[in-house]
Amino acid sequence: MKNKFNYKPLLTALCLGLAALISAPAFADNPFQLDGNAISNEVGHPAGDDWDVVNTTGGNSEGRTGLVIDRPEPTQSIFTGGGAKDQMDITAWKWRTGTPPSKDDLTHAYAAAYVQDNNDFILVFGMDRYDTSGDAQLGFWFLKDEVQPVTGGTFSGKHQDGDVLVLVNFSNGGSVPTINVFQWQGGQVNAVGTGGAVKCTNGYIPAGQNFCGITNAIAVKAPWTYENKDVGLTDMFPPG
């Protein structure tokens, strides 16, 4: 991983079958395929990397997490304490062992960063979940500090000014996300951008928008082994 990508993604919420989101001014030479699948050479694909490339060789990204695997197990690490954690400093976050609802159980997560020639900084990220039925929310914290769960049910690290939170809500089984972006500043989170219900079109950010999201409306091939609640291990992502 190149040093230019110095944010550390921490997953704080939920997601759905396959999703990707980008944050940057709209431009024609998108470095990443925002097309609702994870394969770079699908018929009619736009230019740029896709997750099959980014999660193996890194593609043209400046930095990447790779494929973060969290297989569904009877006992997992989950957030606890009740209520939203996003308004709290990391020193107040708590975790415990437990089993999340199937629709909230993430099996993989992935993120990458790109820097354009004009210094636009672009973040793309996504995840898949064990059960794709039901509403869900995707949440990514991009943190400057090193943050990890520690023995006793707390976390190491703390928020720093400039930490970024992106929330993406998918409801009613829809494929059009509602996107909200926040930044930690002065001890609290502050809204810095709301994309509303913005779907990526033709693999790109729609003109005049800074954010977009997309999920697969139909079953698509998975470039890694995916475990689904209904069918077990499979090489296909179900719709949604």
Residue ranges of model-derived segments:
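Sec-dependent, cleavable N-terminal signal peptides
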Residues: 1-28
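Surface-exposed extracytoplasmic segments
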Residues: 28-240
